[in-house]
Amino acid sequence: MASKCLKASFSSGSLKSPGKAGGGSTRVSNMYSSSSCKLPSPSRGARSFSVCSAGLGRGNYRVSSCLPALCLPTGGFATSYGTGGGWFGEGILTGNEKETMQSLNDRLASYLEKVRQLEQENASLESRIREWCEQQVPYMCPDYQSYFRTMEELQKKTLCSKAENARLVVQIDNAKLAADDFRTKYETEVSLRQLVEADINGLRRILDDLTLCKADLEAQVESLKEELLCLKKNHEEEVNSLRCQLGDRLNVEVDAAPPVDLNRVLDEMRCQYETLVENNRRDAEDWYDTQTEELNQQVVSSSEQLQSCQSDIIELRRTVNSLEIELQAQQSMRDALDSTLAETEGRYSSQLAQMQCMIGNVESQLGEIRADLERQNQEYQVLLDVRARLECEINTYRGLLESEDSKLPCNPCAPDYSSSKSCLPCLPAVSCSTGAARTTCSPRPVCVPCPGGRF
């Protein structure tokens, strides 16, 4: 922050004196330009003090100072003494003071050069840091939007493929269920056919048994008929033989029981046997009918039980198939979720690794920046020490200048010159603060050396 101070510029055009080289008229002009006086901040500010001397020959002797520590008109003070013919006699300052001022000026120039060099290095470091940050920005913040869009499209395609696969799996499972239903129906029909065939075979065996019984009964009837015929034949033979025997005898009528009618007896026996056969046949038919009814009832009950069991089995199979389908769907969903979880973990692990790398890079950069800040703080402390020393030297300079100004005569060329008179000093200087009033130096004559070398 540049400080604005009162400036007093004393420019000397030419001093004319007879008999001297480059003689001419002597002209002194004073110019005062005032502005506000502002104290700079402790951290920065323009502080310069330089002495340039061209020796005793032709040239200029200029003393410039900028002392923002005090609210003096010499905050930007420039005084020049110029003569067309050069200086006559000795200079204002002695040899030791000139050497001291020259050494101070050299040290100040070296300090300023060092400060300028440090500022240039700081600017170069800032530019390098800025360039490095600009170069590192693409690596620190890469653009993954295209990859994310591609991943989203692939995920959508994968989800569509998974949905299509699940639909096909459901269709296949439905076809398997239909095939299982048809298989169970076929097996049921086959079992019913086998049961009917077994019943038919059983009834055939019963029919064969009944046929055998009928054949036995018919054989018994035939044997009984043959026996009856034999008995009839024997009876006729006996009757004939008896008649033949009775024909030769007398006819003796004997009051006896009436003779037995064999035909009637045979008819009665025949009727008895026929009734017995009919009863046996009826009993066999009744037994067969009862057995058949019982078997039919058992078959019906067993078929009903079988149908109920088969329906229960079909329902259980459907339930099992639906549970298997649901289990497969849950397993496929679990596999999809596991794959999605693995992909998400891999993606986030890669992003975490990238973030950790970025954090490591940023931490390393932060460490470098902190090291640079520490170094700059150290340099700043060194510069503060240098500034303090420069302020001390500037105060020393100011004391020397004030002592020299007090030694200079007000008008050495005047006839009523008195060595006791001196230049009027400036008003008391007060430090520039917020509450203090600012004061300016009153105009005073410029002290220049006389042409005759009186001073």
UniProtKB/Swiss-Prot annotation:
One of its GO terms (molecular function) is structural molecule activity. Residues 1-97 are annotated as: Head. It holds the Pfam family Filament. Residues 144-244 are annotated as: Coil 1B. The keyword Coiled coil applies. Residues 245-260 are annotated as: Linker 12. Belongs to the intermediate filament family. This is Keratin, type I cuticular Ha5.
